[in-house]
Amino acid sequence: MSLFSEVAELALEIDSYELTALDRTFESGFTRPSTLITLNGGGESGRGEDVVYDDLDHIAHRDIGPVHDLSGPRTLGEFCELIGGLDLFADAPPIRDFSRRYRRWAYESAALDLALRQAGRPLYEVLGRSLQPLNFVCSVRANPAEEGDAEHVLEPIASRLSKSPGTRFKLDPQPDWSDEVIDWLLASGAVDSLDLKGCYKDTPVDVEASPEFYERIATAFPEAWLEDPEINEETTPVLERYRERVTWDAPIHSAADIEALTWKPRIVNVKPSRVGGLEDLSEAYEYCEREGIGAYGGGQTELSVGRDQIQYLAAMMHPDTP
């Protein structure tokens, strides 16, 4: 029986739902919009977090309010089927189409939370699994190289290591990193993975791909995972040599996406909100287990229950990876 089948028959009763703003502005000036979805029923409440990135999408969602009738489904499976047929951006289409997956995850994770509370059972028990201690990696961006010397570039990493020695990092390498920056990072022994940001286009975070850049980074950090490179005619010959360390995040929305990758990976980043629906997430986890592909998890700067939920799933599905 599939993971989804195990939870689909959970009884579910929904009387009402609420939308609550959770936006937060960080010291860097970045504002993370977020909306808490709360489903109420049977004297319990289940919560999920909408991690869509665009402010206007959140504003439109909150302004229109709880307009959908979610009271019909009597099981979690029926609820997921209903959500799959609803336009959760009824007031205005999303700025980015993949945001539909993020919002679907918010509603379906809230429904799973509610169904489990109404049943009085934890998820690991329903699935016949166990929870294990997690390994965490800190994802952080170095300071821009053009704004100072190596000490300035490395300050976000060095300050964290001074407070928590032994911390390991997922970093976003840049073509303008100096030899001094790379040598310091290598000597620290703290680099777990390097996000090449090659699968993003026209965003504030994408990094221009080049065979020279990829060769330099792959050679400098011989034990680090190389996440999300751009594959093209120029970079493929370089990446072929390091394919055992190449992993993926941004392109992964389903089991089919994992199967369609250029090379069968040793490990991939399975983000529940990026996948979207509970059934699709179940299929992605099961595909990885069946094919002997490892999974690790990553966040979307969740501000509330979304962070707890993805950590719970990681502790149950892939506790030995970050």
What does each model-identified segment do?
Residues 34-36, 133-135, 267:
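Broad gene-expression machinery/nucleic-acid interaction feature
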Residues 320-322:
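Short helix/strand-capping turn motifs
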Residues 29, 105-106, 278, 304:
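Short alpha-helix boundary/capping motifs
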Residues 177-314:
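Catalytic core of soluble alpha/beta enzymes
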